[in-house]
Amino acid sequence: MDFVQRFVIDRSFHLRYYSLDAYLYRAVDQVAWDADITHNRLFWDIWSAFMQPRSLVDAVETLSDYDPDEVAAAIEGMCESGIIEPVGLKDRQFDPLTVELSHVPQAWDYHLVSSRIDWINYLDGKDVKRQDLEQMDKHLSEEAVPSNFHKAANSRPKYDLPSLVPLTAFEFNNSASVAFGHEKAPLPNELSLDIITLLLNYAAAKTDTVNMYATGEHLRKAVPSGGARHPIEFYVVVGDEIAGIEAGVYHYNVRHHRLDAIEIASTSLKALQEASSVLPRSRSKPFGFAFIHTCRFERSMFRYREPRSYRVMQFDLGHIHANEVLAAKILGLDFSETFSVPESIVESVLTLDPFIESAMSAFVVHRHENHHD
């Protein structure tokens, strides 16, 4: 082998899954590489080393934790298989994804890292015990379980909420075909603190507790959550003319079933109203109130310790939106929802650290007009 020539990873290889096995695959010429190699730490260290072009001598020096002969042999095998190739090789058609990702190496690296997961076979009790339960015991000996409760910065108690707001307190659609049909079913319900409370009770409030293995007592809510982690927080943005509550910004305090007022300027209140109503179909309607959903990542990441634990958080958020939509349709409310919230604006106004808690979505209820999105 030429130890001066520079080599690089053939980035058209992708990690694919079949059942519980992982394998490397290149779609251009339908080349697949053995699944077993993806469990080899040296393989991935070599892969990382050759993400940028380098000579074989340089790579051996970089991987000094390994025996040089072992590294050289592994590199030679990866070169022979086509996983590593000489820089400037032009004798094949490159995967378009390589070009698309050439300007975002961090995204490509993240994809690689998040693909190196030692998947748990939940059909195998021994695998669950070894990779899940025993690992949680180890983590608990070193770390504290993140709390399910959070009190927002710069907030103070404002409105204690009733644990039950009966649906019969409002006009409501008692026919599923009316509530969920194509025809609009607006009802003359006045927007009020009671309506806000009812929606919170179905989407955010604690209903019970559950004991989980190792991590102890956790919350139950009207929405399911992966591992009972419930990472989604609610910030309530209230406009004018909402009965029983002052215009302003509030954080829903789950522990005390309470709205805590957050002290912000009127210009910041307007900024949050606009941020939650970012889509054209929402901007064109009178603002009533909105739930801005944020996520405290640590809650889920403590339990699901892999780079793609964001999927569990998105499942949770989807369930929350579903419950909000169901309740709003039954009440005949005019609403909009969006996952296009301008995070930087929300995080700035609410003084959130985006590495700990970030804006995810918004659910907006409009005043007076009779239209559902």
Curated annotation (Swiss-Prot):
Q: Which UniProt keywords apply?
A: Cytoplasm
Location of this chain's protein in the cell: Cytoplasm
This protein's source sits in the domain of life called Bacteria
Q: Pull one GO CC term from this UniProt entry.
A: cytoplasm
* Keyword Cytoplasm on entry: yes
- For whether the record's keyword set contains Cytoplasm, the answer is yes
GO terms of molecular function: oxidoreductase activity
Major location (coarse): cytoplasm
Family, according to the entry, reads as follows: To E.coli McbC which is involved in the processing of microcin B17 (MCCB17).
What is this protein for, i.e. what is its function?
The actions of the proteins TfxB, TfxD and TfxF are implicated in the processing of the inactive trifolitoxin (TfxA) precursor into the active peptide.
What is this protein's name? Trifolitoxin-processing protein TfxB
